[in-house]
Amino acid sequence: MTDKPHQCVIIGIAGASASGKSLIASTLYRELCYQVGDEHIGIISEGSYYKDQSGMTMTERVKTNYDHPSAMDHSLLFQYIQMLKAGLPIEMPVYSYVEHTRRPETLHLRPKKVIILEEILLLTDLRLRQEMNLSIFVDTPLDICLMRRMKRDVNERGRSMDSVIGEYQRTVRPMFLQFIEPSKQYADIIVPRGGKNRIAIDILKAKISQFFE
């Protein structure tokens, strides 16, 4: 954890795909909004910063390894974090997991006291780590992550079960072992058992609440 001015506090939450990190992030966001007001806290998904692939065919898009750091536009995310810290609003990209590229619209986000970042590859990027006041890794067994991912991608993203399993074998698991799991060493706090670990959520909420004092 680095000592940063508290004008804009950055909380990073990483972990395997379907580990429960998004649930933890959304729970913290919802409960802290109730506590301090939504004008003081925001949330950003690294998944919004997949690179724009509008110039590629759908066949080319589906071949992208979305679990590799090169699929992410971390430079844009880093730039936007710096803008928020400078008191400037940003226009967040909106990514379509069905079309595998960015949508034309953006989401307006004003600077907040606390910004929660969440997604799989956040801790693999040194620039992003250096901007974080608190870094968290959600540590969930891979077999549980796979079951959750299958349910999510089939029901919410229009994927077939065969394609989800194939992608898991080709890229998700290998990239987790190569990039995501090693990034756990950079976390200030490791949360076991995913998004339903209520004790961990309460501890994190108490820690983040200190930044509002």
Curated annotation (Swiss-Prot):
Q: What is its EC number?
A: 2.7.1.48
- Tell me the compartments it is located in: Cytoplasm
Q: Which keywords label this protein?
A: ATP-binding, Cytoplasm, Kinase, Nucleotide-binding, Transferase
Locate the residues binding ATP: G15, A16, S17, A18, S19, G20, K21, S22
> Do you know which Pfam families this protein is assigned to?
PRK (PF00485)
Which pathway, metabolic or otherwise, does it act in?
A: Pyrimidine metabolism; CTP biosynthesis via salvage pathway; CTP from cytidine: step 1/3; Pyrimidine metabolism; UMP biosynthesis via salvage pathway; UMP from uridine: step 1/1
Catalytic activity of the protein: uridine + ATP = UMP + ADP + H(+); cytidine + ATP = CMP + ADP + H(+)
Chief location category: cytoplasm
Biological process (GO) annotations held by this record are: CTP salvage; UMP salvage
List the molecular function annotations (GO) for this entry. ATP binding; cytidine kinase activity; uridine kinase activity
Organism domain of life: Bacteria
Got a GO cellular component term for this one? Answer: cytoplasm
- In the record, which residues are listed under signal peptide? none
Family as reported in the entry's similarity comment:
Belongs to the uridine kinase family.
Designated name of the protein: Uridine kinase
